[in-house]
Amino acid sequence: MALGRCIAEGWTLERVAVKQVSWFLIYSWVCSGVCRGVSVPEQGGGGQKAGAFTCLSNSIYRIDCHWSAPELGQESRAWLLFTSNQVTEIKHKCTFWDSMCTLVLPKEEVFLPFDNFTITLHRCIMGQEQVSLVDSQYLPRRHIKLDPPSDLQSNVSSGRCVLTWGINLALEPLITSLSYELAFKRQEEAWEARHKDRIVGVTWLILEAVELNPGSIYEARLRVQMTLESYEDKTEGEYYKSHWSEWSQPVSFPSPQRRQGLLVPRWQWSASILVVVPIFLLLTGFVHLLFKLSPRLKRIFYQNIPSPEAFFHPLYSVYHGDFQSWTGARRAGPQARQNGVSTSSAGSESSIWEAVATLTYSPACPVQFACLKWEATAPGFPGLPGSEHVLPAGCLELEGQPSAYLPQEDWAPLGSARPPPPDSDSGSSDYCMLDCCEECHLSAFPGHTESPELTLAQPVALPVSSRA
């Protein structure tokens, strides 16, 4: 009896356990069916907040989303639904695992520049599905985070280290829009030690030996981002906005040995020659033109005034070009003779006339001013002297030859008649003083019986008429 009773009770307990498990499975299936079939929009006033979402695309086929929300319970599930705004039948589901979800497009699909999605959040809580709007205009091209560069390698040679890397084949049409940043350091240093940026449109980089410490082991890593397009594309709304990618796997390399001497590549020599030769030819031509045109420029800007030193030797040899001292010495000679001092000036007189004669083609001789007509009626003035008393003997010999100077008749003014002298009762005291700088023959004036030798000419006062 006791054994049969225990067996019966065991069967009863087993049946109860089976029933409980069955009911649990049925409840779970019903709850899951209710979450799939019922959508309850999230109310803004109460309930659990959705939190913030960050969805970044690799610009090819993948979107990574991060959800900064409270931890989900075991009875809750959440996912993001991407619905195309161009083709509503295209929908992609991204299920969260530990606040992260990754959407991978099928192999036959890629993201295009004009793709536009609506993102909604779906949560199943206690058998009810809650739907909330995340973004109604999600543009993958403005939320780009590229994959890090792959296959980073180093090639150390004499004096340099060449780093190369690769990119996805789908990004090759956009290679000119890719910008890289390189970080390199010694193994014992931090990564923030050395950086190189502004590496655009290339997949290689050269590190010179002078940038690295000799005898050290270095590590380098790389990251990439897509640069903005031109301003015109930005105004039209078709620009790209990118974040820096994650760092690539580091590569190690020894520092290259520095070169002993400065070796300039052959192509740099050729470029230098192409620059130096035209400059040299240009300077040579400029110097040639300068020396060729300098005499002409001097003749244009500077007048060539001849020096009278060759004709007046005493003026420059004795008086050093002082004309006033030279003329003062010439006047002092006749004055000394009048005072009774015998001074011979024949040599100086002849030298002066010889110097003047060299300037003309005929011997020089003193000329008489025909414009000064002597009037015999004037008191105190002798009559007009004759030409035989004025011209020296040397001038008489050249009467038949043409003179180098203008004839004396041409020196006379237009009016041949001299106005009458002023009346004595007019009281006019206008006189002009004539100072003869040269010596005159006294025999030219009648009534003088002095020596025929030259004497100093005295100033002569001539009356000047004030009447028109």
From Swiss-Prot:
Residues 407-426 are annotated as: Disordered. The chain crosses the membrane at residues 271-291. PROSITE patterns: FN3, HEMATOPO_REC_S_F1. SUPFAM superfamilies: Fibronectin type III (SSF49265). A motif (WSXWS motif) lies at residues 244-248. GO terms for cellular component: cell surface; extracellular region; plasma membrane. GO terms for molecular function: interleukin-9 receptor activity. Residues 292-468 are cytoplasmic. A motif (Box 1 motif) lies at residues 301-309. CDD domains: FN3. Plays an important role in the immune response against parasites by acting as a receptor of IL9. PANTHER family: CYTOKINE RECEPTOR, INTERLEUKIN-9 RECEPTOR. This is Interleukin-9 receptor. It comes from Mus musculus (Mouse).
